[in-house]
């Protein structure tokens, strides 16, 4: 199979059917959709009718530089954009947070104070961080299913898909030079796309504001509007002297991009066209009512309660110690992010009546699908969801309780590495663990969450190990005293002295035993059953998805997000979250000063910003506020359909210029992973002018501004 053959037009009868759904007249709701860039020509008319001035080729092209060449997958879960001819890269502060933390210490607290490289020599390398540019995407459905016939079993179909996928990936990455590829299933396996990337592994930290700007509002404001968070960080991509990907080397030079974003200083106004280009992570737009009911009535409430326990414990100790605050800043942010999202998702689903609406849709579908091909799908799905529920519940509780115990996870990982002779890997794990570990937090969280596991997970799902330990110690609290008191993995010096020969002692350690026994229980008693049931559900969704497309031939179906590059477009728009309340789409520096409070950590801004505000020293970044006085724009909201993974995505105006970077959604609209509602769903973006203001006036890093190209 040649590369030329792989990239030929492979659209067969099945793909044509799907494309008819994709090409259809309008989306289900205005501004709903995460569209594949390679098919954006089918949406460009709608985009242009809403104000967009560029062409489909300007958005995505394999024949010339296009906007896609300025967008990267940052790490393995965020988006970034190139903003200069010298590889300068912009993403969110929370996307770069882990790198900022790794470079921080009590002596050099870059989380608290910020960091700015005033020369190329001061830019900090980040081992393990990479960015990936999409070279091309291609429908390869016919190639992937070559050799498949309806007579084959699902296992045989999987084999065909896997063999053909590996062959395609091998051929398209043969050149090397940082190429990597994936074959992704769309529409539950009705369609397959090849994504070819070029990955750069030398990405250096250039600048980050202090957390009092980059995380302003903290967990209090997370998912909320109005928002005033300066959520950005700056990196630079480096390459070898031929501009090819290379691991870190002092000989590397700044990457020269095919395309970078020009920066608009024109600002935003209600109704302006907006366009988000990024890598949304996961959506479930087409699941049936029973799947939504489990999320809103069982899963979200349970996970919220469990994470509340951990967050309360972390915050208590973080407020008492600067060292602990630094150690747990990133961990706390990670725990809180989904915690608040789940709350908004649950409320949004209930407010919209999504379960009832889907049930009504399913009744109409069932009436239409009275023939043999689709008539049994919904009853079978309903039955499978009922069988799946207890296993999913057990898995989610395991993930939020036993698997979240820091000591035990660490102990299990180190023991495994030492037993395999990987002393260097064990030492690296140990160094990273003890740098950011505080035992009282972990122990108190253990007692709270494991007590919840004992109470909430049905007894028939309890591991035998759990029953034995509770019988032995009488309570979770006593069990915690013994486990944390007796484990040698709480002592860095003892861990450093361990060798592979100590295998027996390691595996007898209570922390290692906890990790291994719970893992063994999950692997044997939960995972196989959940996997089998999910597999059966997915196979039915392949048919249900195809049936929905036939049922609604004029609806534009977009594939669920799967961390592949997508286009979402909409407009600048305020919204009304409650009766008598309307939120304007722009926030300003005035809002920061209204919230500023040195007594509240989330709202304690740098003194430098207070001084700038007092002097009204805003420079060219000033605008006239609603009160007629000068201020600085901070954030804005729009109707673009986004998800996790869109963090850091460029927000682009009608001329293709950068106006901001996406970093959040409003709390009332977080159910958009399941159902998009144009009245409530808003993505929150950082205004690029606040980024520039911060670089100029707070950081004094004018040299970075000189790299950028500005347009009015």
Walk through the language-model features, giving the residues of each.
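Terminal presequence/propeptide segments associated with secretion/organelle targeting
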Residues: 2, 6, 22-712
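Bacterial N-terminal signal peptides
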Residues: 12-22
């Amino acid at each position: 199979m040649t590369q030329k053959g792989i990239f030929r037009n492979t659209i067969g009868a099945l793909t044509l059917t799907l494309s008819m759904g994709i090409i259809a007249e309008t989306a289900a709701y205005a501004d709903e959709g995460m569209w594949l860039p390679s098919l954006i020509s089918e949406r460009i008319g709608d985009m242009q009718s809403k104000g967009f001035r560029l062409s489909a080729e300007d958005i995505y092209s394999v024949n010339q530089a296009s906007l896609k060449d300025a967008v990267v997958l940052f790490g393995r879960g965020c988006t970034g954009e190139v903003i200069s001819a010298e590889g300068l890269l912009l993403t969110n502060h929370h996307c770069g947070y882990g790198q900022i933390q790794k470079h921080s210490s009590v002596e050099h607290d870059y989380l608290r104070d910020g960091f700015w490289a005033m020369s190329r020599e001061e830019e900090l390398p980040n081992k393990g961080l990479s960015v990936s540019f999409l070279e091309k995407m291609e429908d390869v459905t016919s190639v992937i299913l070559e050799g498949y016939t309806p007579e084959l079993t699902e296992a045989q179909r999987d084999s065909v898909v896997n063999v053909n996928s590996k062959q395609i990936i091998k051929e398209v990455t043969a050149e090397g030079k940082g190429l990597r590829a994936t074959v992704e299933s769309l529409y539950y396996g009705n369609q397959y796309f090849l994504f070819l990337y070029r990955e750069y592994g030398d990405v250096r930290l250039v600048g980050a504001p202090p957390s009092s700007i980059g995380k302003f509002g903290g967990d209090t404001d997370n998912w909320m509007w109005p928002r005033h968070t300066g959520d950005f960080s700056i990196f630079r991509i480096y390459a070898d002297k031929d501009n090819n990907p290379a691991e870190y080397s002092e000989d590397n030079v700044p990457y020269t991009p095919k395309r970078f974003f020009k920066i608009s200083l024109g600002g935003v106004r209600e109704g302006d066209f907006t366009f988000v280009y990024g890598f949304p992570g996961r959506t479930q737009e087409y699941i049936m009512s029973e799947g939504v009911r489990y999320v809103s009535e069982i899963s979200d409430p349970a996970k919220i309660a469990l994470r509340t326990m951990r967050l309360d414990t972390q915050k208590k100790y973080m407020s008492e110690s600067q060292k602990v605050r630094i150690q747990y800043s990133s961990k706390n942010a990670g725990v809180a992010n989904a915690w608040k999202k789940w709350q908004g998702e649950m409320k949004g689903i209930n407010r919209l009546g999504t379960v009832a609406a889907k049930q009504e849709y399913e009744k109409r579908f069932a009436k239409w699908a009275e023939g043999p091909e689709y008539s049994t799908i919904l009853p079978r799905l309903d039955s499978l969801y009922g069988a799946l529920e207890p296993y999913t519940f057990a898995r989610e509780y395991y993930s939020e309780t036993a698997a979240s115990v820091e000591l035990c996870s660490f102990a299990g990982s180190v023991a495994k590495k030492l037993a395999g002779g990987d002393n260097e890997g064990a030492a690296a794990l140990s160094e990273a663990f003890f740098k950011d570990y505080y035992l009282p937090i972990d122990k108190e969280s253990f007692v709270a969450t494991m007590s919840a596991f004992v109470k909430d997970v049905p007894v028939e799902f309890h591991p035998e190990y759990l029953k034995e330990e509770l019988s032995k110690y009488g309570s979770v609290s006593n069990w915690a005293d013994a486990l944390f008191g007796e484990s040698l993995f709480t002592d860095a010096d003892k861990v450093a002295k361990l060798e592979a020969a100590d295998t027996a002692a390691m595996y007898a350690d209570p922390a290692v035993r906890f990790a291994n026994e719970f893992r063994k229980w999950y692997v044997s008693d939960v995972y196989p059953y959940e996997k089998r049931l999910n597999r059966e559900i997915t196979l039915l969704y392949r048919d249900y998805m195809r049936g929905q497309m036939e049922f609604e031939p004029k609806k534009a179906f977009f594939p669920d997000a799967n961390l592949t590059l997508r286009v979402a477009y909409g407009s600048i728009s305020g919204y009304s979250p409650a009766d008598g309340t309307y939120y304007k789409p722009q926030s300003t520096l005035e809002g920061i000063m209204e919230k500023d409070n040195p007594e509240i950590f989330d709202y304690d801004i740098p003194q430098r910003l207070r001084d700038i505000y007092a002097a009204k020293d805003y420079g060219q970044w000033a605008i006239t506020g609603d009160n007629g006085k000068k201020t600085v724009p901070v954030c804005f909201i729009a109707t673009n359909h986004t998800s996790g993974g869109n963090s850091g995505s460029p927000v682009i105006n009608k001329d293709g210029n950068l106006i901001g970077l996406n970093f959040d959604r409003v709390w009332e609209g977080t159910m958009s992973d399941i159902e998009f509602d144009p009245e409530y769903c808003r993505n929150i973006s950082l205004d690029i002018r606040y980024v520039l203001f911060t670089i100029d006036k707070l950081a004094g890093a004018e040299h970075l501004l000189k790299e950028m190209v500005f347009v009015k």
